[in-house]
Amino acid sequence: MLDSIKNRHTITSIEQDSLKSWLRLILLFTIGVVGTVGMWSVVVVMPAIETEFNIDRGKASLLYATTMVGFGLGNFLIGKVIDRFGLTIPIIFETFILVSSYLTAIISTEFWHLLILQIFMGTAAATFFGPAMADIGNFFEKRRGLAVAIIASANYVAGAFWPLLISSFLELNNWKDVYFIIAIICATIMFPIAYFLKNNIANNIS
């Protein structure tokens, strides 16, 4: 009961629906589009991976299945971490995991290596989906529904954006080169955004 009262007091003390709230929305939307790349890149490069490891489509589809396993686990596990530590630390950690997974995939010599890495990519994608929606709800009151809907749409915008971009990269590069480019893009965009998101509501709850 006391925790509930304390949390309500903290939320009402935030300047909701302000310019800072909308800025946070833009940052979370951007990181949602970029950070969920792991759910979509594997779909585009799957034919190239089939050729690389001499496997059929059925076996290659396990890559997407393991991504979804990671996504499901991530929404639960990372959500609990964010409740305790706030949004910034998990975003920095999962960005590091995401970038490392892409770079490690480049030097992978066995198909099962990629399966494990896709679990981590799925977990990272989850960090920038459900928890981000929960976070932005604390910074809006009048436009809360709209704000949450915009953050939710980031994953689907990513589904339209990334396959087109990756397909164009694959026309000139192999899948490993594309993964390296993705790693650089994620690191360049997401680490700075994590810095600007440091004033998360959970960090202010004592």
What are these language model-derived features?
Residues 73-112:
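Conserved MFS/SLC helix-loop-helix module at the cytosolic interface between two early adjacent transmembrane helices
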